[in-house]
């Protein structure tokens, strides 16, 4: 789960991390009111969307008068903001953050992630803040410094000081940087975050260290422990299809292709998508119905996939372990009839009650294309999507 910048800064503030004064605004008049409350002479008007690259896309403006705050708020609020993370369709801006201006001298980067290779929490830092860290990592990996943090000890003073020095924090400002890094770690740990990022971390002309941005991602499996984080959820920023899928306990992620995938098990789902791509196709979605799929869930899964206007074919790939193939067959038949399926459907089933499931499909009268192997299924669905 992602949250907005202003929400991330609320979290940082709770953990003692220095951030500029600012508030969210949901209208132009409210933006002006916030600016007047903060006082001048400089304000930053920021679009609030769940994507990076807002500045390059025109979603961050520096205002030097209340009139400019109104002008920029009017420009940004409601705009379709396109960044390298939104895709060409962009994301509509429904919220702003109005913040006091900052004396920017040195922009740094710091973040915390869970490293899958070491299975540890890793603190990363770079002297190249205020830009795309992915680009820095690709072109200048030597500028990315990493510290492995042991959960039993937390981020030690020496570790924080060492990283701060390596990324260029002046010696006199290292105690401030240490407090920010340790506060960021505590926020990451105590909220079950999967990412906590400050970009940029600013060192001002007088040596003050302050977080000018905040980005958090949270482990959705841990949200039951954090109702205060769930309260930050903004459904306007999420894919409507993914929201609908969650109501039926379906793991669904929209993709850019034209071949729908309905699979049981995340591993098999990823292997299915890889095999489709191997034979020249493009998956339209990741969809895991899980081990306890019912006829209703399968029907809803079909409805979700068919809402995609680019859909050209569907592949159902089932391994019947806990899940019985006859139950899936029943759902496929009911779902196909309920939605008046009008795209080619390829079905491959193996495992528990496989023969019964195949017989049910064969007797259904539906134009279902059967396959015995995953490779055969992928080849057939790619051909069907291409109209062959």
UniProtKB/Swiss-Prot annotation:
- What HAMAP family has UniProt attached to this entry? Succ_CoA_beta
- Encoded by which gene? sucC
The record describes the protein's role as: Succinyl-CoA synthetase functions in the citric acid cycle (TCA), coupling the hydrolysis of succinyl-CoA to the synthesis of either ATP or GTP and thus represents the only step of substrate-level phosphorylation in the TCA. The beta subunit provides nucleotide specificity of the enzyme and binds the substrate succinate, while the binding sites for coenzyme A and phosphate are found in the alpha subunit.
Please name the NCBIfam families in this protein's record.
PRK00696.1, sucCoAbeta
Domain annotation ATP-grasp: ranges: 9-244
Its pathway, per UniProt, is: Carbohydrate metabolism; tricarboxylic acid cycle; succinate from succinyl-CoA (ligase route): step 1/1
What is the native source organism of this protein? Answer: Burkholderia ambifaria (strain MC40-6)
Q: Name one GO molecular function term.
A: ATP binding
Give the residues the record marks as binding ATP. 46, 53-55, 99, 102, 107
At the top of the EC hierarchy, this enzyme's class is ligase
Cofactor requirement? Mg(2+)
State its Enzyme Commission number(s).
Answer: 6.2.1.5
Q: Name one GO cellular component term.
A: succinate-CoA ligase complex
Q: Does the keyword ATP-binding apply?
A: yes
- Asked if Transport is a keyword of the record, the answer is no
Q: What is this protein called?
A: Succinate--CoA ligase [ADP-forming] subunit beta
